[in-house]
Design a protein with these regions (language model features):
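Short glycine-/small-residue-rich Rossmann-like dinucleotide-binding loops
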Residues: 112-113, 304
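Structural motif detector for alpha-helix initiation sites
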Residues: 8, 211, 242, 295-296
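N-terminal export leaders
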Residues: 6-15
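Oxidoreductase cofactor-interface core, primarily capturing Rossmann-like NAD(P)-dependent enzymes
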Residues: 35-70, 74, 92-95, 100-102, ...
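Rossmann-fold cofactor-recognition segment
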Residues: 80-93
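C-terminal segment of classical bacterial N-terminal signal peptides
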Residues: 21-29
Length: 312
């Protein structure tokens, strides 16, 4: 079984020790050090942002080469103690951003959450500030449906942001992430508790990916050359729908789940969410990270105790 990185709750001390092993005898990182300039991580106190910071440290990036931007920089104290710069920055307050990004060479622009406000406008504020601050390369966390030509709905904001970045004049990389699989643990636990899953041939099947794998992909792009002006589909290894979720949960928990036909007039969202535009799997993650993406089965195996607890 592949070792899913999402199960690792590694201490920062261990991350630094791992990073030290990557460092050359001269004290500089062989592929991820200061020579590439400082890396700005927006949304650094969020779930994805925090994982990216830990990945960067584990890859040997000195904390002093990190500029961590957040609306709540007080939550970044653990990284500040290691030497990272922590700064306030709010995409809705454009006046805060040039100072927040100052001194950076690369920017990981983590998209703000759906429903958190007008995303293209907020992202444009960040892009304009990045250009003004002299950022040379923007890495953006986009959405996989764009790769199949989807430019409306959930993909619309991301498509508009991608276009703004491409027009900015700086180098770019689009990380078109699929939907996080982490949330499937709760869904699977409910199936186990009920002993039943409602499925349909109309169910959408999605290349779910763990948040941890998305962080690994971002860190890989930020610390290695050759990713300029390229778009990557960051997905899990398999297309997954309710049927496959139930089968994986049953196998891991050792408890049967009956597959029952979904009602014809059941919620459209359970069958149509994402649609064909979300039916994407790719080897891009493996090319960037040097390992295969975590499967839903592996995710469930790592959270077996949680599955069993929720099934009671």
């Amino acid at each position: 079984m592949r070792n899913p990185t999402h199960t690792r709750r590694t201490s920062l001390a261990l991350l630094l020790a791992c990073g030290a092993m990557i460092m050359g005898a001269t004290g500089t990182a062989s592929s991820a050090g200061a020579s590439q300039g400082k890396i700005v991580v927006s949304g650094a106190s969020g779930q994805l942002g925090g994982l990216v910071v830990k990945e960067l440290l584990a890859r040997g990036v000195p904390a002093s080469d990190l500029i961590l931007v957040s609306r709540t920089p007080g939550k970044l104290a653990e990284f500040e103690k290691l030497g990272a710069a922590t700064r306030f920055g709010d995409f809705a307050k454009p006046e805060s951003l040039p100072k927040a990004f100052a001194g950076g060479t690369k920017l990981l622009l983590i998209s703000i959450g759906f429903g958190a406000g007008p995303r293209p406008e907020a992202h444009e504020n960040a892009i304009d500030a990045a250009v003004a601050a002299g950022i040379k390369h923007i890495v953006y966390t986009s959405f996989v449906a764009i790769s199949k030509g989807e430019t409306t709905g959930l993909a619309g904001d991301h498509f508009q942001t991608e276009e703004l970045i491409k027009k900015s004049g700086v180098a770019w990389t689009m990380l078109r992430n699929s939907i996080y699989s982490n949330g499937l643990v709760g869904q699977a636990a409910k199936m186990l508790a009920e002993g039943k899953a409602r499925v349909s041939d109309a169910d959408s099947r999605i290349g779910y990916v763990t948040r941890e794998d998305c962080a690994a992909a971002a860190a890989g792009v930020l610390t290695s050359p050759g990713h300029e002006n390229r778009a990557y589909d960051i997905t899990g290894p398999d297309l997954i729908g309710p049927r496959e979720i139930a089968q994986a949960a049953s196998a891991v928990a050792g408890k049967p789940i009956e597959l029952a036909a979904a009602d014809a007039d059941g919620p459209a969202a359970r069958r149509g969410f994402g649609g064909p535009a979300m039916a994407v799997t790719s080897e891009d993650f493996a090319k960037i990270a040097g390992r295969q993406a975590t499967s839903v089965r592996e995710l469930f195996e790592a959270h077996r105790d949680e599955l069993l607890a929720g099934a009671k």
